Regions:
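Register-specific detector for alpha-helical tandem repeat solenoids, activating on a conserved position
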Residues: 76, 88, 108, 119, ...
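Intrinsically disordered, low-complexity regulatory regions
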Residues: 1-65, 382-419
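Alpha-helical scaffold repeats of the Armadillo/HEAT/TPR superfamily
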Residues: 40, 78-86, 121-129, 163-172, ...
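Alpha-helical solenoid scaffolds in large eukaryotic transport, assembly, and signaling factors
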Residues: 17-37, 46, 50-89, 97, ...
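HEAT/HEAT-like alpha-solenoid repeats
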Residues: 42-49, 53, 85-95, 128-135, ...
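Alpha-helical solenoid repeats of the armadillo/HEAT superfamily
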Residues: 51-65, 95-111, 136-154, 165-166, ...
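Flexible helix-coil junctions and inter-repeat linker/turn elements that act as hinges
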Residues: 69-73, 83-84, 112-117, 126-127, ...
């Protein structure tokens, strides 16, 4: 039976007033509780290092909450009071699983801080016991160890190499090669760690060689239905696709359709890495370009015109790469799919690099088939290009003038240039 409806406007106002009071009280109570925990920051390191499991568990929970809310000062408290070597010892030789879990979680939290704070873990030889816990112990400890190693590797090439050189990647790779055996939360953390191992310059040869030799493993992660795992795999593909010795393996993995699918869902987290990957594949050769076209690249471009500027630029770059390297038939296919209207629409965006990419794409299309002038005019592209000949950005201005000279010379403002 549904609850009775308010009988009068006065009753409705009273209900709304009480709801506002309830929310206000809840917010004040949460703020008061949080402030109390902040006041305990100087005590948390001592509780973590005590011999009382209850205190250690409480301190670990509070430590995690404070770090998640950006209270990085608590990390300095733990470091300054000598907590890191104690936590490393707990992780390596702790008597109970609870104690080892507390240690792994605390080290993961410290690695969420800055590079200087993370370096303390490395200096205190904290990486080896974290790697050891990847292959032993319960799933919760393994998950926290993965988090810690992932966080450490994210900070710099130096910290990444320290993690990989310790054997972390090979242990992690074992988990990823059997994606249906670990629980999903472990797979989520492991796929994120893999992406972090692929960041930075120069790339780590061991990681890239293993991925290249076992590309189906990464593709399997990309095909998974879990949103976060797929996003992490998509990010990894974007990081390796930009490398000359990896792009062929990425191309041969035949992932274009899946990348477009992730964009269509839509999954905003995947927009940028998916488009970056497609742009790299499209730049390879005619066969690769056709795979990207057939997957529905123009849809991604049209969809991106309503997205953030970075996404629009990446989608336009993929189109440009095909117009640079594709056959006349492939360029015609892009046109028939409807690429001209979104390219013209993006000529007025605020980002000059995106504008230049779109201008170059339109120039290539017109060079391939001058008969497409009418389509550009219908979309307002000609007028926008004419306006761009006065743009403050030198590159955009020069490309616009070149297009006008070749296809609409009557639109060039000669008085402006002669004066």
């Amino acid at each position: 039976m549904s609850p009775p409806r308010p009988e009068s406007e006065a009753e409705l106002k009273k209900i709304e007033k009480n709801e506002r009071r309830r929310k206000s009280y809840k917010a004040k109570r949460e703020a008061s509780s949080y402030q109390k925990i902040k006041d305990e920051i100087p005590e948390i390191p001592g509780w973590l290092m005590s011999n009382q499991l209850g205190k250690q568990l409480e301190a670990s929970d509070k430590f995690t909450m404070l770090v998640e809310k950006g209270e990085i000062s608590v990390i300095d408290e733990v470091i300054n009071q000598g907590g890191v070597p104690v936590l490393v010892e707990f992780l390596a030789t702790g008597d109970t699983a609870e104690l080892r879990l507390i240690a792994a979680q605390s080290l993961a939290n410290i690695a969420r801080g800055n590079l200087v704070q993370t370096q303390v873990i490395i200096d205190q030889n904290g990486i080896p016991p974290l790697v050891y816990r990847l292959g032993t112990g319960n799933d919760e400890i393994r998950e926290m160890a993965i988090c810690a190693l992932s966080n450490i590797s994210y900070h710099s090439t130096h910290t990444r190499e320290a993690v990989i050189d310790s054997g972390a990647f090979l242990e992690l790779w074992k988990l990823l090669k059997q994606p249906f055996e670990p629980r999903l939360t472990i797979l989520t953390k492991a796929s994120l760690a893999l992406a972090n191992f692929c960041r930075g310059e120069p790339p780590n040869k061991t990681v890239f060689n293993q991925i290249r030799q076992n590309m189906p493993v990464l593709k399997q992660l990309l095909l998974m239905t879990d949103k976060q795992v797929a996003t992490n795999a998509c990010t990894t593909f974007s990081l390796i696709a930009s490398k000359a010795d990896m792009i062929q393996a990425v191309d041969e993995a035949q992932i274009c359709a899946r990348m477009i699918e992730l964009i269509k869902k839509p999954m905003p987290e995947c927009f940028e890495p998916a488009l970056l990957t497609l742009a790299e594949i499209a730049a390879q050769n005619h066969v690769s370009a056709q795979a990207v076209i057939s997957a529905g690249l123009v849809f991604a471009l049209v969809n991106s015109t309503r997205a953030e500027s970075d996404f629009r630029k990446d989608a336009a770059q993929a189109i440009l790469n095909i117009t640079n390297n594709g056959s006349p038939e492939q360029i015609l296919s892009l046109v028939n799919d409807g690429c001209i209207p979104p390219l013209c629409a993006l000529l007025t965006c605020a980002d000059p690099m995106t504008v230049c990419i779109c201008l170059n794409g339109l120039r290539n299309i017109l060079r391939a088939d001058q008969a497409r002038k009418g389509m550009v005019e219908e979309c307002g592209g000609m007028e926008k290009i004419a306006v761009l000949q006065h743009n403050e950005n030198t590159d955009a201005r020069d490309i616009a003038v070149e297009i006008l000279e070749g296809f609409w010379p009557e639109k060039i403002d000669w008085d402006h240039y002669l004066n």
